[in-house]
Amino acid sequence: PAQDIYSIMRAFNSFDVYRNNENKFIVKTYRAGLINELKNLNVELVLSEKFETFWKQMSNFSTSEDLKLPEGIHAEFREYQTKGFGWLWFMYKYGLNGILADDMGLGKTLQALAVVQKAKEEDGPAPTLVICPTTVVFNWESEIQKFAPTLTTLKLAGVDRKQFFKEIPNYDVVITSYALVRRDINKLKEYNFRYVILDESQNIKNAMSQTAQAVKKLQASHKLALSGTPIENK
């Protein structure tokens, strides 16, 4: 029926589906929710084996009992932290970006460090950029020293920070502030990061702000936003 065709075309248009050179329709991973909508419209789908596995795992997500915490993390994880880490690792494996939103004091930094450490152990070293409020920079340094001491850390702060830009590829974690990322974006955007982690990410909730615009210019395989209180998560 014409109505069904209209519904299918509307779904394709709204979910950024496009056709490649092999005449196949391509769906971005983060638009995977389209699958259910198309199935409800009785569209016959042929999915790649990798995407089929991803879709099944995402639809019935639970932290695998086989998933081990990284060896370099020195901490006892509570059950909810293990689940959070499992979700972050799932997103990492499938190239997804995400938000870890939880009340303050429940270990978001630890969970983020765990996935950074796990990625290093599984895939080798690559720099992660952590952007946080100036008042939290020391906390990140302290947490890394305590929970992930094998991660090498570079803090970009002070008037002499620019001389260290060339060292960025040699470190596991690079820490800077929202205030400085605005000033240094022309240099920072030259580097390819494994992760860009935004702590207290409400700092970029205004998409038109200079800070948000600067962050959008950063190159990273994965982006993770951390947010702390219910009012900030809205």
Regions found by a protein language model. Give the residues of each.
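ASCE P-loop NTPase motor core, strongest for the SF2 helicase catalytic module
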Residues: 44-234
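Charged, low-complexity intrinsically disordered regions
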Residues: 1-57, 125
